[in-house]
Amino acid sequence: MLAQDAVNPGDTAWVLVCAGLVLFMTPGLAIFYGGMVRTRNVLAMLQQNIIALGVVSLTWVLVGYTIAFGDDAGTGLFGNLELLGLTDLRVPPAPNLHVVAGQVTIPTLAFVAYQMMFAVITPALVTGATAGRLKFLGWAIFLAIWSIVVYAPVAHWLWHPDGWLANFGTQDWAGGMVVHASAGAAVLAVLLVVGRRRGWPHTAAPPNSIPLTILGAGILWFGWFGFNGGDGLQANGVAAQALINTHLAAAAGMLVWLVAERFKDGHSTVVGSVSGAVAGLATITPAAGYVNALSAIVIGAIAGIVCHTALRLKYLLRLDDALDVLAVHFVGGMLGSLLLGLFGDSGINPLGKDGLFFGGGGSLLWHQLVGVVAVVAFAFVLSWAIAAAVQAVVGLRAPADVQEDLDHAQQGAEAYHLGGVAGLSGTGAPQRRTGRDNAAARPAQPVQHARLVTATVDPMLLPTTRELRDALLGAGAASIVVFDATVSAAEPASRSLPRGYWQDQDLLDRARVEVVVEGRAVPAVLDVLGRYGVDRTESFVQDVQLATDVR
């Protein structure tokens, strides 16, 4: 380890704080994604993100770090295996390791911890694209293999002084290629393996909690100060420049995205606000420590318009990217890497190079282009191979019959359990599980001349659960069961989704209500259902065998 008298307390404290900030981004990403998926897939999304903290942290210490930052094996492609399990850390990070200038003055373990957090969050980005389709065991295995086989070598190429792209002249301040481009290439590969959700692109999947998404975006924005601010491994002016550039690019990306939304759809949205900010953050990542503040604003503004336009990319490629990871992170990471070739300013950072707009000619732009192509090609091919192998052995795609309700299928739980009527949440949205309301339970009694009344109800028209329950019981219902149903619309309906693009919807989510009631009470039950948009001609009444219990 580095001798204590050689450690700079300020630099060390800054890097350790930044490591904590980047760690915080992973639960922030989970919350950001969790708010945008369907109600019955929230816990699955949270778990798919959080598990990266467990899996990748261990693979990084055991194998990943030595591949990424061990002494080069002689090819510039990966490090040797001398640091397996961190068994030999007697020296600090080498001078100029990663992007720091001069002698490194932090303990090696601080560098290990900081880089670990990047390795953790990178594959977690993929989960936004595959929402509602991943088998948990297969995903955990994919995480472990991908972090070793894909992420660690790419980190070595760009962030090790002997990496082949670093020697070639390609620059990546904080992960435009190492993080965002490689994760985006993995998205392309994994989507080819796991396929599309049922009904896509004609069935809409609106977010379950926009406030949750905004909270997650705020955590990401906050954590990004550590993500981009700590990469110089020093608490100095370059760190301050990277931090202010990060914030300015996010601000510019937000505003331009909102203008694009307003121009396209006639309105702007709060989800559009944070989407534009995240696009700006992803795009400035490779350039944050190499450009000036005005350039950061321009880069963020370009990100806002380009990434918003890229929302259509998944339709052109026919890939079901659920939460637009390709448009925001993949396009953003590649775009920022290339824009560095235009806006690079060696006056900001002595380790940087001048881009085309600052008198440096086109050499840096060429180096950036080669880096982007190499990283994307490598990450895509290996990611596809890993995903296909996992799918063949243990399965990566969840079975079709559980994709609509991964929370119950994988965890036996639900994110929101507020219901008073069996099968309904507190907001009236249908849930798969059924049960009985103990507060309103009645002793089981035979129901003479029983009738089964069946109807489908728009969840948006349902009252509070207690109101519906009381109304049906008051009308004479002996048993109430509610569960999910999907019906075909008479004509395709168009609805605007949160990120500002239009999508035809042919299938509609409905709540199917089944009520067992004595024959004479059927009209009263139909009247109750009629209050909530169910026409009598849309209800089905049939005789049933003697009913003797309340479900």
What are the functions of these language-model segments?
Residues 2-445:
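Glycine- and aromatic-enriched membrane alpha-helices
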